Swiss-Prot record:
Coiled coil spans: none
Keyword Ribosomal protein belongs to the record: yes
Name of the protein this chain belongs to: Small ribosomal subunit protein uS17
Subunit field text: Part of the 30S ribosomal subunit.
Single GO molecular function: structural constituent of ribosome
Keyword Flavoprotein: no
PANTHER family in UniProt: 40S RIBOSOMAL PROTEIN S11 FAMILY MEMBER (PTHR10744), SMALL RIBOSOMAL SUBUNIT PROTEIN US17M (PTHR10744:SF1)
Keyword set, alphabetical order: Ribonucleoprotein, Ribosomal protein, RNA-binding, rRNA-binding
Function of the protein: One of the primary rRNA binding proteins, it binds specifically to the 5'-end of 16S ribosomal RNA.
Encoding gene (name): rpsQ
Amino acid sequence: MPKRLLQGVVISSKADKTVTVKVERKFKHPIYKKFVKVSKKYAAHDSENKYQEGDKVSIIESRPISKTKTWVVVNGE
């Protein structure tokens, strides 16, 4: 099964080797037919501590690194 790849924005980089990435997605509500924007936060591993708040990054699924980290930052802009 392929690993999932998501794009988002770093909203916190205070922890050591960890960034919090906010991923937004849009979908059409099945009843009201309105586009709804939903966001979710992921804790991702950043081994070099090189990403700061506001950076756009891509994260990929990986083995569990800690209790909450199962994503790794692969590249950013």
